[in-house]
């Protein structure tokens, strides 16, 4: 009888772990690490996490041809909030993406969010399959 009582506690013990490591982690991993457009763009380096469920986040790069970095942040929130994912801006700058020449130049800073770690941005881009053959230069 004691064994059955002990076994009845298993779902209560397993449920939080199952919720933490399945649904939320899958939604976090399902977010593409890089989304930048062709040409000269502003970009943001963003740490994303599932609030309350994941201990560590994932760093993503988002860039677009917009007037300011705040517009990029608004589009990030529109993309991630329905999934329950929180975003923290690590900084921003500019990216010159020339896919025809296979070159990317990362430089500058964001007036709104401050400067991003361009070396970290370069490493993320090089790890992404689309940009692994590109020559990526960083100017601080």
From Swiss-Prot:
Substrate binds at residues 42, 110-112. One of its GO terms (molecular function) is protein histidine phosphatase activity. Keywords: Differentiation, Sexual differentiation. Changing residue 27 to N: In strain: Port-Louis. Changing residue 72 to V: In strain: 1631. The active site is at residue 69. One of its GO terms (biological process) is sex differentiation. Signal peptide: none annotated. InterPro entries: Janus (IPR007702), Janus_sf (IPR038596). One of its GO terms (cellular component) is cytosol. It comes from the Eukaryota. Belongs to the janus family. JanA and janB regulate somatic sex differentiation. This is Sex-regulated protein janus-B. It comes from Drosophila mauritiana.
